[in-house]
Amino acid sequence: MPVSHGHFRNYYVVPDAEFRSMSGILENPLLHNRKYVFSDRHDAGKQLGVLVKTLPSVHGSVVLAIPAGGVPVGREIAAALGSRLSLAIVRKIQIPGNPEAGFGAVSWDGQVLINEGLRAVLGLSDADIETAIERTKKNVHERIVRFTHGRALPKMSGKSVILADDGLASGFTMMAAVKSVRPLSPSRIIVAVPTASATSAELVSRNVDQVVCLNVRTSRQFAVADAYRQWYDLDDREVVHELTDMEL
């Protein structure tokens, strides 16, 4: 929800997640708390597509993948449903001095999501946050140009929208995508990911209609990569190659 928080009153701030029941999350109990359960992102996407396809009224869904790692996953889900894949371009806002971690996210329409609890712990100044946000917005714009070539997102009004990524760590990147999709009036929003921490899956599930996650893990230390036997970070060239293969 939009809240007033000093200098950041126009941003969407989410408090720390509190673990609750796992309602609204469809998982594979055989994969619960296990590691290295998928060969790679394509394998994970194929398995996920089989499960997503069992949901009611998913025919004709809009499938949106979050680059980079979500593209091969979303590609397989779209193939299972006979849908066309589109992109939900969202980037985490990197913590100064620690580019592997983030304290929020920026989506394609300029929406900004701040992890307020982490921001307070880090003790970041307003100037630090503004600099990081502007850098992230620039990166999002560059990716829009590189990956979409000006193609508009499909109409989502009255349709089921499936948001796909290769996993949920904090969940804030996905939450930013959800916030940008919701005003487009989809009939429902489904988040489909191969793996997630239990807390992030619960956080996201409270804000969408359904979370489909094959591999939910409850350990305090969580890494998306630990679900995959073959893991590496996709670069922009590989994303373009995936999209070219699909003639997007």
Predicted regions and their residues:
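PRPP-associated nucleotide enzymes
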Residues: M1-L248
